[in-house]
Amino acid sequence: MNRFVIICLLFTYYVIWSLLPIFEIENSNPVVSLLFPISSNVAIFLPIFLLLIGFTLTGSVLGVLLIRSDKKKKV
């Protein structure tokens, strides 16, 4: 299957999942409960958590690279 189609489907799922509380249909329908078993609050905090982890890892890698390059210049 094409990657673009998979990414579009995941994005559509995420958007619907994050918009459920706005229309107050999160727990009203059993089909919705089956399709979206985790609370929509998780959909809001998930990108924040992933961004924090990404920035932390990027900063750590850049810091290690800067320290290593500085040590090589001194030797």
Curated annotation (Swiss-Prot):
List UniProt keywords, sorted A-Z.
Membrane, Transmembrane, Transmembrane helix
A GO CC term assigned to this protein in UniProt: endoplasmic reticulum
Membrane-related topology note: Multi-pass membrane protein
- Entry keyword annotation includes Calcium: no
Which GO biological process categories is it annotated with? dolichol phosphate mannose biosynthetic process
What stretches pass through the bilayer?
5-25, 42-62
Name the source's superkingdom: Eukaryota
Q: Where in the cell is it found?
A: Membrane
Q: Which GO terms describe its molecular function?
A: enzyme regulator activity
Which Pfam family, just one, is annotated for this protein? DPM2
Annotated InterPro entries: DPM2
Q: What is this protein called?
A: Uncharacterized protein YIL102C-A
Q: What organism is this sequence from?
A: Saccharomyces cerevisiae (strain ATCC 204508 / S288c)
